[in-house]
Amino acid sequence: MDTGRRAEGSKPDPDPNPNEAMWRAILDGTDPVYARNRGRLKHLPGAPRCKMCAAPFGGPAGILMRWRGHAPWPNNPDYCGACFQLLDRYHGGAEIESSFLFADIRGSTTLAEGMSPTAFRTLLDRFYDVAVRVLVAHDGIVDKFVGDEVVGIFIPALAHDEHPASAIAAARALLEATGHDGPGEPWLPVGVGVATGTAFVGS
């Protein structure tokens, strides 16, 4: 019979998320290490620079910082890879309030049936490219591409307390970029949704 008591001398169960505090501090922008690094790196010349740690991307200092792992991050080139590689090394995550953008091509199956595979692949790549540029411009991160869908996330560390407004602005910008703001038909039929709430963000 399980009494719920731990046998004397037995070890406690390991913490399933030992890095939660670190993740939370980084995701909500309160991590002291980033604050110290930013204080040092912002004095190095070389615009543009990482929006999180202020590492320069341009000039001689930018070349040096690239050698140190501070090259632009592919998922959002306004930030450096070093700011996110740390999280890759420490598996875990934290529940934080964040905003998400979901965008997909409406009627993609019918659309694909009406063109060659190469033409549809080109159209899909164009959609991905536009979505990435819109997310980057509004302090979002590309969370993932799933078929004809793009998912973006807006966290406090990057978009600050305005992450819901940033997600909404990105949604509007994506609709405009795909031609939904004019009198004619859009070059790509896209649907966009935004949600804000507490979510587990991590690896």
Segment roles from a protein language model:
Residues 134-166, 177-203:
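Catalytic core of nucleotidyl cyclases, primarily class III adenylyl/guanylyl cyclases
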Residues 123, 127, 166-170, 174:
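Hydrophobic alpha-helical membrane-association signature
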Residues 40, 100-106, 171-186:
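Hydrophobic transmembrane alpha-helix bundles
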Residues 28, 89, 180-183:
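Charged, solvent-exposed alpha-helical segments that act as regulatory interaction surfaces
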Residues 34-142, 146:
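Juxtacatalytic helix/coil linker segments
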Residues 1-51:
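A broadly conserved sequence feature marking short terminus-proximal activation segments
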